[in-house]
Structure formats: C-alpha cells, structure tokens
C-alpha cells in the first residue's frame, strides 16, 4: 500500500469494509425520437387546415408515491469513484528526524506532487462503497483491534460487505491526486493519530473479546494501546469522506491473488 502514516501499534484493526455501489442514477430514459411524416411519392401533400392551437396544459404534478433516487451507497458508507493510477511516483522532499537525530527513512515530512509513471498501465476505473469509519463505525468508540484476517473477513460478511482490496484501500486514501496523506503532501501528526512510539507487548495478547475478559491481558493491552476514539480527528479524512485511513489502527485488506 502507498498511503502513508498508519499508527505503529502492531495490533491490527478489524477493517473498513467495502461493498458494491449502485449504478442506477434514477434518471429517466431519453424520449424516443419521432420522424416527421412524409408525402406519398408522386403526390403533393395538401396543407393542413388552419386550426387554432390549444393552450398547452400544465404538466401534472408527480404522483405522491414518487420517491427520490436511492443513494449509491448504504447508510454509513461513502462512494469511492474515479481513475486509479497503479504505478505512482511519490518523491520525498524532506525526511523526518529519527530518535537518534538522523533521517527516518520510513517517515516523510513533505512530498512533491505525485506523478503517475510513464510505464504505468491504463488507469483503472474504480467505483465502490466503503465504510466511513473504522469498525465498529460508531463515533466515540475505539476501533476494534486484536483481530485476525479471517475474523475481519467474517465480520464484514456478516454485514453483507467484504474486505476492501489493497487497491481499493489505496485509492480511497489517495484519491485521483494520489495524495501520500489523506489531507495532502505534508505530514501533520495533529491531523491524524500517527507518530506515537511503538510499545512491544511483553506477553501474547489474546483475541479482542478474550483479551478484555482476561485481567492480565487487558492490562497489557491497555499499556501498549495507542488507539483514540473514532471521530477524534475530523481532519484525518480522505477526498471521498472516509476517516482515519492513514491514522489510528491499521486495517486488514484483501489480496485476491495471495493467501492471507
């Protein structure tokens, strides 16, 4: 994935799930075109008698049962649509400093404008729905972590959704401008929950529900936990209106060509 800056928790979150977008925009079909009548061959058409044209009647109001077109995505999801460049050049202009005073090659303070490389294949048309928030998608709650890939896939399926592919996640984060950060080209730790120190768990952490029910596991989880409540960073939002894609918890994605 190209989108930069997820929090370094080492505790993978469940997911932001994806789904299919509606394709019907609700617009009526175009009216059929009618060809003008022609005179029969060999005869001259007689002019029509002069008749006063009636005053056009006002268009009838729409029936009370008429409903607006359905939204492209279900409630809680956002439409992600556009052309996705599959080979992008994102050149770092300024590295952040590491703890030892040197340059941190994994973190870039400022990028130049992204470019779709000359060798890139044709941009891929993308159109899909994506959860606006990390699971469970409730503002004020913390995203769920300590979840396996198979559990994440199962939970998405239980809601009639699926895991996003890696390409979908990247495009939802970058948009057509191929932004290295959802909010632009310069890293800002105040806009997203990023750049917290990584704390290594001193013991094996159980799956989420089991860990919270185990006092020793819950205490260790609380010690290394760097999550913040969903919606805490309103500026950490992608061009499509999806939050925390490069902040807070890491998310699982689907790579159909690989085994999980």
For each of these PLM feature ranges, what is it?
Residues 1-26:
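Sec-dependent N-terminal signal peptides
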Residues 149-158, 162-260:
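Functional-site microenvironments in short loops/helix caps that host divalent-cation chemistry
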Residues 20-157, 177-178, 184-186, 192, ...:
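Short, compositionally biased
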């Amino acid at each position: 994935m190209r989108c930069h800056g997820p929090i370094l928790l080492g505790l993978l979150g469940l997911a932001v799930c994806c789904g299919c977008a509606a394709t019907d925009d609700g617009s009526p079909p175009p009216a059929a075109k009618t060809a003008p009548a022609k005179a029969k061959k060999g005869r001259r058409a007689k002019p029509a008698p002069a008749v006063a044209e009636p005053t056009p009647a006002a268009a009838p109001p729409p029936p009370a049962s008429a409903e607006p077109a359905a939204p492209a995505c279900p409630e809680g999801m956002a439409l992600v649509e556009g052309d996705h460049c599959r080979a992008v050049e994102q050149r770092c202009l300024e590295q952040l400093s590491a703890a030892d005073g040197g340059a941190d090659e994994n973190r870039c303070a400022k990028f130049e404008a992204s470019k779709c490389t000359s060798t890139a294949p044709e941009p891929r048309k993308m159109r899909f729905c994506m959860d606006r928030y990390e699971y469970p998608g409730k503002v004020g709650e913390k995203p769920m972590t300590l979840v396996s890939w198979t559990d994440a896939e199962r939970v998405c399926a239980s809601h009639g959704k699926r895991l996003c592919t890696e390409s979908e996640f990247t495009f939802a984060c970058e948009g057509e401008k191929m932004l290295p950060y959802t909010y632009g080209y310069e890293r800002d730790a105040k806009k997203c929950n990023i750049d917290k120190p990584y704390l290594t768990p001193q013991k094996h952490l159980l799956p989420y529900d089991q860990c919270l029910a185990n006092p020793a596991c819950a205490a260790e989880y609380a010690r290394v936990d760097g999550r913040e409540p969903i919606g805490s960073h309103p500026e950490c939002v992608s061009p499509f209106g999806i939050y925390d894609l490069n902040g807070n918890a890491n998310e699982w994605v689907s790579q159909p060509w690989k085994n999980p």
